[in-house]
Amino acid sequence: MITIEISINLELIISFYLLFILGANNVANAIGTAYASRATTYRNLLILFSISVIIGSLFAKNVGSTVNSLSSDALTALIISALVMTLSTYKKVPISLHTVIICSLIGLNFNSSNLYVFGEILLSWILSPIIAVVIAYILYSAYEKIDISILKKITMIRYFLLISAAVVAFNLGSNDLPTVLGTFTTSQIIYIIGAIFLCLGAYLYGNRVSETLSMITNLSVSSAFIAQLSGGLAVTIFTALGMPVSTTQAIVGGILGVGLTKGIKTVRWKVLKNIIFWWVVAPIIALIIGFIINRMI
């Protein structure tokens, strides 16, 4: 009984820390494009983010129940993910929690893992940002050419951008949060506390990764909205195909797509190369650590 209680308390501490880091890193998914376009103040964006995350946590129980049935090696996977996410956040690089967790679990269960399925997932991780680039390029090119006054009203587009930011933040609370906490609890109170830790991470360190996204290319309110929309559409396409993909990678693809419409030189390739480098390295680190632990046991 004491062993179980200690294990749950340890999972709780690690989970809250991971959510804190998740907030610091993935807040950029929700408000990074709005921040880059100066749609409103960063303080207002953080308030919008926090409200949306906490509301999302109220709808997290179903996902938490599903994750709760798949809790094998959960504590070890959480520790590995916390380490890798901390490193990525320190490097100011947006990283997907799902890619890190999946790779850590592959490493921990290397002997029994279905590598064919992992290959399909890996392919979806590569293709999703590319699809987002294509969608964003097409949509923004079309937007620049159309002459419909209502679609050119910045105030209206700003509202759309803020709504899309709220939706992404809601999904962090309703989906990513229970991915972390659902391995050992489905308590609504714990989910709300977890949401507070997530918001705290965003408030204290979220500007680091958001600034990185804002450096990829210059964004207006309209291009920021199309980048966010394109990333969302790319994720929706792969979700419909049953493939887990990274919202982080898709949104970066969307930003790149709108940047390319203005010319290759408008994209800061050094920033983008650093992001892609860590997209490759971070999951590999998680996989290797998991594999080493697998061999030691």
Swiss-Prot record:
<feature type="transmembrane region" description="Helical">
    <location>
        <begin position="154"/>
        <end position="174"/>
    </location>
</feature>
<dbReference type="GO" id="GO:0005886">
    <property type="term" value="C:plasma membrane"/>
</dbReference>
<dbReference type="Pfam" id="PF01384">
    <property type="entry name" value="PHO4"/>
</dbReference>
<protein>
    <recommendedName>
        <fullName>Putative phosphate permease MJ0630</fullName>
    </recommendedName>
</protein>
<dbReference type="GO" id="GO:0035435">
    <property type="term" value="P:phosphate ion transmembrane transport"/>
</dbReference>
<dbReference type="GO" id="GO:0005315">
    <property type="term" value="F:phosphate transmembrane transporter activity"/>
</dbReference>
<feature type="transmembrane region" description="Helical">
    <location>
        <begin position="99"/>
        <end position="119"/>
    </location>
</feature>
<feature type="transmembrane region" description="Helical">
    <location>
        <begin position="225"/>
        <end position="245"/>
    </location>
</feature>
<keyword id="KW-0592">Phosphate transport</keyword>
<keyword id="KW-1003">Cell membrane</keyword>
<keyword id="KW-0813">Transport</keyword>
<keyword id="KW-0812">Transmembrane</keyword>
<keyword id="KW-1133">Transmembrane helix</keyword>
<dbReference type="InterPro" id="IPR001204">
    <property type="entry name" value="Phos_transporter"/>
</dbReference>
<feature type="transmembrane region" description="Helical">
    <location>
        <begin position="274"/>
        <end position="294"/>
    </location>
</feature>
<feature type="transmembrane region" description="Helical">
    <location>
        <begin position="67"/>
        <end position="87"/>
    </location>
</feature>
<comment type="function">
    <text>Potential transporter for phosphate.</text>
</comment>
<feature type="transmembrane region" description="Helical">
    <location>
        <begin position="121"/>
        <end position="141"/>
    </location>
</feature>
<feature type="transmembrane region" description="Helical">
    <location>
        <begin position="2"/>
        <end position="22"/>
    </location>
</feature>
<feature type="transmembrane region" description="Helical">
    <location>
        <begin position="45"/>
        <end position="65"/>
    </location>
</feature>
<keyword id="KW-0472">Membrane</keyword>
<feature type="transmembrane region" description="Helical">
    <location>
        <begin position="180"/>
        <end position="200"/>
    </location>
</feature>
<comment type="similarity">
    <text>Belongs to the inorganic phosphate transporter (PiT) (TC 2.A.20) family.</text>
</comment>
